[in-house]
């Protein structure tokens, strides 16, 4: 991966970064530190933010969820993509693919947003990203 490459950060990565007890925490932390050191252009989406906040609120505490939300604002250069109705409509095409069974609607919208922005890399621990043609970092 080149320096200053665009990278999409998925829910699983945010969760692993936020929760030190998460089995993927160390792997996520190492990937995150490498991305920051290489000046990666980081993106995520409103659906991913909402999904992550909800998970942290339910499986950790409200304070953890709020602290994570506040930490996003401190990340210089993080782009949070909105998800239009047109993008959601386009996302449904991924559900027709037989190789993407048990796909989440949030992941499908992520694929559309990544494709539209030309993002090839994802900090994600979900096999669907690779199946859909994106490259994992971390």
Segments predicted by a language model, with ranges:
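Acidic, PIN/NYN-like endoribonuclease modules and their adjacent C-terminal/linker elements
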Residues: 1-6, 111, 115-138
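Short, well-structured N-terminal submotif of metal-dependent ribonuclease cores
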Residues: 1-44, 57-71, 138
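Active-site neighborhoods of divalent-metal-dependent phosphate/nucleic-acid chemistry enzymes
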Residues: 2, 79-121
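Acidic active-site catalytic centers that drive phospho-/nucleotidyl reactions
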Residues: 10, 51, 107, 126
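Structured helix-beta-strand junction loops
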Residues: 38-39, 75, 132
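Amphipathic alpha-helical segments within well-ordered protein domains
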Residues: 50-53, 92
């Amino acid at each position: 991966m080149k320096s200053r490459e665009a990278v999409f950060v998925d829910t699983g990565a945010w969760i692993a970064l936020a929760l030190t007890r998460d089995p993927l925490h160390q792997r996520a932390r190492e990937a995150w530190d490498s991305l920051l050191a290489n000046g990666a252009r980081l993106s995520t989406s409103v659906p991913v933010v909402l999904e992550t906040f909800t998970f942290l609120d339910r499986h950790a505490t409200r304070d953890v969820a709020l602290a994570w939300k506040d930490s996003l604002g401190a990340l210089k250069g993080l782009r949070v993509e909105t998800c239009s109705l047109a993008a959601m409509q386009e996302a449904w095409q991924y559900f027709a693919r037989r190789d993407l069974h048990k796909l989440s609607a949030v992941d499908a919208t992520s694929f559309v947003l990544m494709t539209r922005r030309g993002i090839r890399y994802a900090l994600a621990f979900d096999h669907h990203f690779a199946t859909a043609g994106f490259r994992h970092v971390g």
